[in-house]
């Protein structure tokens, strides 16, 4: 009788704790939903875990394109700060895609128009946006490393078998069965097997922990994609139809995940699952099956990351728009190519001749400035900008270059009006000595300028180049002579400021 009362009390206590956990989880979800509503249009994340930013570049590195913003231009324009200002994404896939999008300008009107329709929809339809953000929030982040870091090292694990784990599971159930026949002997056996299982579990779990984290993320990604597929919005159908076609490919992954690969151990069910995993090694068994399945589905996982990441990144871009005091949708046109010598004053690049090039921005400003001074620019040729010290020349140049990148990535300009050709934007502005290679500032700048001239001779859109204080630090006579030739070469190849 006493044992029954004790058992009932323990059961009641466990039930109360379980129900309280569910209630707390419900309250947390409600609070998170409200925070997502309030945070739209606010500045992005300001706090990052140590090393977290290092993994953000991996999606970009895995998806090269014909032209992407190079490191010199990225650093010259402080685009890391722009990314951080914009990054209100809820998942690792989202922030990695956002970074890649900012470094990969589009030269296709169709692509940018599709992006524009999605941006408008995500800004206006709050309910759908918040629902999607909740899904992305549950998908979450991978932490210090990118999913692509883990994927690159899967081969290190080799082939993994489940025989020994199934054997200890069998022993565990046999000792439990023995406890009904001979309680003292059975309980002793259960204790020994439990200690052995926990010890071997902790040892093996430590070896696979980084990969287990990544597989948890893949599992959450698939679960999130399943939830996304249930959203019905005409503007999203192009992306979500691709998700629905991909989901059947992950059947084996889902089956292996059901063996113990839970998304979280913080909720009540997660705590129970953690103890079951220690006893039965279910998550390790699931990991070994999943390892083989992931190797088979690498390309489909990448496609899923791309779709989910794009939608999360576009919500962040829509929020960035919403946070700006003024912005406009750019009007971009492809440069016209003409036959050799067919047009007077055409600009030549890589044997191509461009005409009708233009750059027009009204009430342009830099989005990182709290109280910016707005300016206009309109030109069809190169511009030599002069002025007194501390008059804002460099800031203006950076604002123009930055806005042309934003125009061709998130289809947004920090200006009242933008009408321009498509450009490959390159800069040479904030260089410094390279002590590691022993190169002086002069050599570093010459190499930087050469890369721009080389780009102008390669196929693609015309190059829009920004050079700040050519060859500063060189003696006056040589600087004037060299700068004249450099500017002349730039003028013959591309529009420059």
Over which residues does each language-model region extend?
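ATPase nucleotide-binding head domains, primarily ABC-like/P-loop NTPase cores
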Residues: 317, 324-495
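Alpha-helical bundle segments enriched in helix-capping/polar residues
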Residues: 1-381
């Amino acid at each position: 009788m006493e044992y029954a009362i004790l058992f009932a009390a323990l059961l009641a206590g466990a039930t109360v704790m379980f129900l309280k956990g569910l209630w707390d989880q419900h309250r947390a979800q409600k609070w998170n939903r409200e925070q997502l509503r309030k945070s739209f249009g606010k500045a992005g994340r300001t706090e990052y875990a140590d090393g977290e930013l290092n993994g953000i570049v991996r999606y970009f590195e895995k998806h090269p394109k014909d032209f992407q913003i190079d490191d010199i231009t990225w650093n010259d324009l402080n685009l890391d700060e722009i990314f951080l200002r914009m990054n209100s994404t809820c998942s690792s896939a989202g922030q990695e895609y956002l970074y890649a999008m900012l470094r990969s300008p589009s030269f296709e009107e169709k692509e940018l128009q599709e992006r524009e329709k999605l941006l408008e929809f995500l800004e206006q339809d709050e309910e759908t946006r918040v629902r999607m953000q909740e899904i992305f929030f549950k998908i979450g982040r991978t932490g210090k490393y990118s999913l692509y870091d883990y994927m690159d090292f899967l081969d290190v694990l080799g082939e993994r078998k489940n025989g020994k784990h199934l054997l200890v599971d069998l022993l565990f159930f046999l000792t439990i069965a023995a406890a009904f026949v001979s309680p003292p002997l059975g309980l002793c056996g259960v204790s020994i097997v439990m200690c052995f299982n926990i010890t071997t579990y902790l040892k093996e779990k430590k070896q696979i922990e980084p990969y287990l984290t990544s597989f948890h993320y893949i599992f959450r990604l698939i679960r999130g994609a399943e939830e996304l597929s249930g959203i019905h919005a005409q503007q999203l159908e192009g992306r979500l139809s691709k998700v629905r076609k991909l989901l059947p490919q992950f059947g084996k992954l889902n089956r292996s995940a059901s063996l113990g690969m839970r998304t979280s151990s913080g909720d009540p069910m997660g705590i129970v699952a953690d103890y079951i995993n220690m006893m039965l090694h279910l998550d390790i068994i699931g990991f070994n099956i999943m390892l083989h399945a992931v190797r088979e589905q690498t390309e489909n996982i990448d496609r899923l990351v791309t779709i989910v990441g794009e939608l999360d990144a576009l919500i962040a871009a829509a929020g960035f728009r919403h946070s700006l005091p003024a912005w406009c949708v750019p009007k971009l046109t492809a440069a016209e190519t003409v036959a050799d010598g067919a047009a007077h004053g055409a600009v030549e690049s890589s044997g191509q001749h461009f005409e009708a090039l233009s750059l027009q921005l009204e009430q342009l400003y830099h989005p990182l400035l709290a109280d910016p001074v707005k300016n206009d620019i309109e030109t069809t040729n190169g511009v030599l900008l002069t002025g007194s010290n501390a008059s804002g020349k460099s800031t203006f140049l950076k604002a123009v270059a930055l806005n042309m990148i934003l125009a061709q990535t998130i289809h947004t300009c920090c200006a009242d009006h933008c009408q321009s050709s498509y450009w490959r934007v390159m800069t040479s502005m904030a260089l410094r000595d390279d002590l590691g290679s022993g190169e002086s500032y002069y050599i570093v700048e010459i190499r930087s300028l050469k890369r721009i001239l080389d780009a102008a001779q390669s196929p693609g859109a015309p190059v829009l180049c920004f050079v700040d204080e050519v060859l500063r630090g060189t003696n006056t006579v040589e600087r004037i002579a060299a700068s004249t030739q450099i500017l002349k070469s730039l003028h013959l190849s591309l529009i420059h400021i």
